UniProtKB/Swiss-Prot annotation:
Protein name: Uncharacterized protein MJ0437
Source organism (scientific name): Methanocaldococcus jannaschii (strain ATCC 43067 / DSM 2661 / JAL-1 / JCM 10045 / NBRC 100440) (Methanococcus jannaschii)
Keywords carried by this UniProt record: Cell membrane, Membrane, Transmembrane, Transmembrane helix
GO-annotated cellular components: plasma membrane
Entry superkingdom: Archaea
Upper classification of the organism: Archaea, Methanobacteriati, Methanobacteriota, Methanomada group, Methanococci
Membrane topology annotation: Multi-pass membrane protein
Pfam families in UniProt: MbhD
Segments passing through the bilayer: 28-48, 51-71
Protein location: Cell membrane
Major location category of this protein: membrane
Length: 79
C-alpha cells in the first residue's frame, strides 16, 4: 500500500471521530461528507469503482445536502 492510502485512512478516521464529537450540526454534516469522500477514494484504490462512485454520490453529496437541508429547516422552526 502506498503512503497516500494510509494518509487517507487516517483522514477518514479523524473526520469521522471529529463529526462524532462536534456540537454544531452543520460542521458534523460537512465532516461526515468528507469522510464519505475519503471512503470513496479508498474503494477506488481497492479496485471497486462502482462502489466508489456510489459512495461519492451518496455519502459525499446527496446525504450531506439532505441532512443540511433538514437541519436548516428544523432550526428555523425552533426559532
Amino acid at each position: 500500500m502506498e503512503i497516500i492510502h494510509y494518509i487517507v485512512i487516517i483522514m477518514t478516521l479523524l473526520s469521522s471521530l471529529a463529526s462524532l464529537l462536534q456540537r454544531d450540526l452543520i460542521k458534523c454534516i460537512i465532516l461526515s461528507g468528507f469522510a464519505g469522500l475519503c471512503m470513496a477514494y479508498l474503494y477506488y484504490a481497492l479496485l471497486a469503482p462502482d462502489v466508489a462512485l456510489t459512495e461519492a454520490i451518496l455519502g459525499g453529496a446527496i446525504l450531506p445536502a439532505l441532512f443540511a437541508f433538514t437541519v436548516r429547516r428544523t432550526q428555523r422552526i425552533d426559532e
